[in-house]
Curated annotation (Swiss-Prot):
It is a single-pass membrane protein. Forms part of the preprotein translocase complex of the outer mitochondrial membrane (TOM complex) which consists of at least 7 different proteins (TOMM5, TOMM6, TOMM7, TOMM20, TOMM22, TOMM40 and TOMM70). Its main location: mitochondrion. It comes from Mus musculus. The keyword Transmembrane helix applies. GO terms for biological process: positive regulation of protein targeting to mitochondrion; positive regulation of type 2 mitophagy; protein import into mitochondrial matrix; regulation of protein stability. Required for assembly and stability of the TOM complex. Positive regulator of PRKN translocation to damaged mitochondria. Acts probably by stabilizing PINK1 on the outer membrane of depolarized mitochondria. GO terms for cellular component: mitochondrial outer membrane translocase complex; mitochondrion. Changing residue 25 to R: Homozygous mice develop a rapidly progressing emaciation after 7-8 weeks of life, leading to sudden death at around 9 to 10 weeks of age. There is lipid accumulation in the liver. Keywords: Membrane, Mitochondrion, Mitochondrion outer membrane, Protein transport, Transmembrane, Transmembrane helix, Transport. The chain crosses the membrane at residues 21-40. Belongs to the Tom7 family. It comes from the Eukaryota. This is Mitochondrial import receptor subunit TOM7 homolog.
Amino acid sequence: MVKLSKEAKQRLQQLFKGGQFAIRWGFIPLVIYLGFTRGADPGMPEPSVLSLLWG
């Protein structure tokens, strides 16, 4: 196992926490964004913000 200094361990912990934050709060908006940019399947109506909010 590699010996890491206390400062290096803290930096790695910050990096992992930042990655977890980005994944947790960015996944759903990314999926919604990709859904809007790729468009609907053929034969389906185009998605709109109102249909997203009110079903």
